[in-house]
UniProtKB/Swiss-Prot annotation:
The lineage of its organism: Bacteria, Pseudomonadati, Pseudomonadota, Gammaproteobacteria, Pseudomonadales. Residues 620-641 have a biased composition (Basic and acidic residues). It comes from the Bacteria. It comes from Pseudomonas putida (strain ATCC 47054 / DSM 6125 / CFBP 8728 / NCIMB 11950 / KT2440). The keyword DNA repair does not apply. One of its GO terms (molecular function) is unfolded protein binding. The modification Phosphothreonine is found at residue 199. Residues 602-641 are annotated as: Disordered. Acts as a chaperone. This is Chaperone protein DnaK. InterPro entries: ATPase_NBD, Chaperone_DnaK, Heat_shock_70_CS, HSP70_C_sf, HSP70_peptide-bd_sf, Hsp_70_fam. NCBIfam families: PRK00290.1, PRK05183.1, prok_dnaK. SUPFAM superfamilies: Actin-like ATPase domain (SSF53067), Heat shock protein 70kD (HSP70), C-terminal subdomain (SSF100934), Heat shock protein 70kD (HSP70), peptide-binding domain (SSF100920). Keywords: ATP-binding, Chaperone, Nucleotide-binding, Phosphoprotein, Stress response. Induction: By stress conditions e.g. heat shock.
Length: 641
């Protein structure tokens, strides 16, 4: 069995980790960084860029550079939070046929799981490069407050990326795993406060020693899946736009290129203000009008930034209060506060959290890496490599069905330990009713319409009977991933109907399979692109070395040889400009062939000049084609010396 990797699929950055020889290791990507920007870009030549390379070209390609897509995963286009995002991002958010929020880039409409899959593929490749073997299994983290559709969509993203997702695990729980594995024995209760790029979660977790086993039990969880560092950036961008408008009278809101530059500058300034008291945002040539180019230069103090985002920080405190209440614990009983997510580096966030919980947060947990590390530990538990850990997570939101009068009747209350299974008997609302529709809901409101609809299905062929007589047993079963399976059974006939809840939106199996095929086709395209690039490089090198050889040979080359070589060189140069690898290979072969006699002459002459040359005289025939590259690299080395 191969390794099960742990992936923190973040809104802003992602991270991959593995448990190796009993130690958790965060794996560096090809650029040498331990985290990878969750950014995917579609270049004009069709290439798909992921991570730092996508981030670098965002300013010049804002419409086709997709960031913070995790905020759209598993969401309907009509949702308020999606409508708000449409106004804030330079790329297009569109309505899919099933009503989901999709994105458009490079003229194609794509589902958020497809975009997330590109990031997951990069994480998968990072792990494979390090391990030197294929990786097919992963534990992927999600915000604790993700609903069923969002969890399912994350699992779909894993499938599209070619990963068998062994478990979906909540981010705060993963962070607690990373924190608690090496702690002293004994029971303690921790708060994980996770403020990431796009989401906020808080979980109350009890870490206990039970018969020598680490038991991690989530007592309660709460959060906001549309609050994070991106919102902090947006406040700063709005401020910079307003300041520039006051000074120049020009509005940068409608200029995607300027907005992308502002986004980069705002993120950089925000990070700097975590350690400095003030910083300058200096963007020359941000725009231009009839009078000439305009430059943006604004000085921002830490106090100013804090005043801009104070209400966002305050918004994180109410979920903390609710989580403590649901867990039945007073803030004073919390042993440790663990901060996770890059935004928790902000001094104001740390101060608010310390004030609320009455204690400073721990500084020995890396906020960017703890979640991926916890996912790797859970992967090792599932693989059987770690035996002394038991994880008891909870369902973050109440689950139920719509009953008469548009009421939501709960079957599984929020913060119920999972996996779990609950059944309840319902009946018909009308006489001789032959079918019932089971409408599955998730949320905390009493009115069904105010909650998230997860899906509907029908139980048909109910024998005619007066209302209230038929007995329909509805069963909710939540698996360890927090994904819901629902069944309904007519107790009189034994007839059953069941579904895995995949929302009335979500991706169908056919769509996922098509996206998997697309991803595989992209991988094939990437391989062909690499091979073509290698062939072009080989062609260029051969042209250069052949021309150098002819120049060095001088009058030792006959006019016929010179003409033949020049014709072959020109043909190879033309082939290198094209996209046909086979044509390049053929022209390389041709040039090697026509230049071989000259190479042999040069080699023989050089050997004759050396005292020990006699012993090597028999070699030219054996070397033949390879002689051009090898010989002239060697001459270069001699020249250097």
């Amino acid at each position: 069995m191969g390794k099960i990797i742990g992936i923190d699929l973040g809104t802003t950055n992602s991270c991959v980790s593995i448990l190796e020889n009993g130690n958790v290791k965060v794996i560096e990507n090809a650029e040498g960084a331990r985290t990878t920007p969750s950014i995917v870009a579609y270049a004009n030549d069709g290439e798909i860029l992921v991570g730092q390379s996508a981030k670098r070209q965002a300013v010049t390609n804002p419409h086709n550079t997709l960031f913070a897509v995790k905020r759209l995963i598993g969401r309907r286009f009509e949702e308020d939070v999606v409508q708000k995002d449409i106004k804030l991002v330079p790329y297009k958010i569109v309505k899919a046929n099933n009503g989901d929020a999709w994105v458009e880039a490079a003229g194609k409409e794509m589902a958020p799981p497809q975009i997330s899959a590109e990031v997951l593929k990069k994480m998968k490749k990072t792990a494979e490069d390090y391990l030197g073997e294929p990786v097919t299994e992963a534990v992927i983290t999600v915000p604790a407050y993700f609903n069923d559709s969002q969890r399912q969509a994350t699992k779909d993203a894993g499938r599209i990326a070619g990963l068998d997702v062994k478990r979906i695990i909540n981010e705060p729980t993963a962070a607690a795993l990373a924190y608690g594995m090496d702690k002293a024995k004994g029971d303690h209760t921790v708060i994980v406060y996770d403020l990431g790029g796009g989401t906020f979660d808080v979980s109350v977790i009890e870490i206990a020693e039970v018969d020598g086993e680490h038991q991690f039990e989530v007592l309660a969880t709460n959060g906001d899946t549309f609050l994070g560092g991106e919102d902090f950036d947006m406040r700063l961008i709005d401020y910079l736009v307003d300041e520039f408008k006051k000074e120049s009278g020009m509005d940068l809101k409608n200029d995607p290129l300027a907005l992308q530059r502002l986004k980069e500058a705002a993120e950089k300034a925000k990070i700097e203000l975590s350690s400095a008291q003030s910083t300058d945002v200096n963007l020359p040539y941000i725009t231009a009008d009839a009078t000439g180019p305009k430059h943006l230069n604004v000085k921002i103090s830490r106090a100013k930034l804090e005043s801009l985002v104070e209400d966002l920080v305050k918004r994180t405190i109410e979920p903390c209060r609710i989580a403590l209440k649901d867990a039945g614990i007073d803030a004073s009983k919390i042993d440790d506060v663990i901060l996770v997510g890059g935004q928790t580096r902000m001094p104001l966030v740390q101060k608010e959290v310390a004030d609320f919980f009455g204690k400073e947060a721990r500084k020995d947990v890396n906020p960017d890496e703890a979640v991926a590390m916890g996912a790797a530990i859970q992967g090792a538990v599932l693989a059987g490599d770690v035996k002394d850990v038991l994880l008891l997570d909870v369902s973050p939101l109440t689950l139920g069905i719509e009953t008469m009068g548009g009421v939501m009747t709960a079957l599984i209350e929020k913060n119920t330990t999972i996996p779990t299974k609950k059944s309840q008997v319902f009946s018909t609302a009308d006489d001789n009713q032959s079918a019932v529709t089971i409408h599955v809901l998730q949320g905390e409101r009493k009115q069904a319409a105010q909650n998230k609809s997860l899906g509907k299905f029908d139980l048909a062929d109910i024998p005619p009977a007066p209302r209230g007589v038929p007995q329909i047993e509805v069963t909710f079963d939540i698996d360890a991933n927090g994904i819901l399976h629902v069944g309904a059974k007519d107790k009189a006939t034994g007839k059953t109907q069941s579904i895995v809840i995949k929302a009335n939106s979500g991706l169908s199996d056919e769509e996922i399979e098509r996206m998997v095929r697309d991803a595989e086709a992209n991988a094939e395209e990437d391989r062909k692109f690499e091979e073509l690039a290698a062939a072009r490089n080989q062609g260029d090198a051969l042209v250069h070395s052949t021309r150098k050889m002819v120049a060095d040979a001088g009058d030792k080359v006959t006019a016929e040889e010179k003409t033949a070589i020049e014709a072959a060189v020109v043909a190879l140069e033309a082939a290198v400009k094209g996209d046909d690898k086979a044509a390049i290979d053929a022209k390389v072969e041709e040039l090697s062939k026509v230049s071989a006699p000259v190479a042999q002459k040069m080699y023989a002459e050089q050997s004759a000049e050396q005292p020990q040359g006699g012993a090597q005289q028999a070699e030219p025939e054996a070397k033949h084609d390879d002689v051009v590259d090898a010989e002239f690299e060697e001459v270069k080395d001699n020249n250097k010396q």
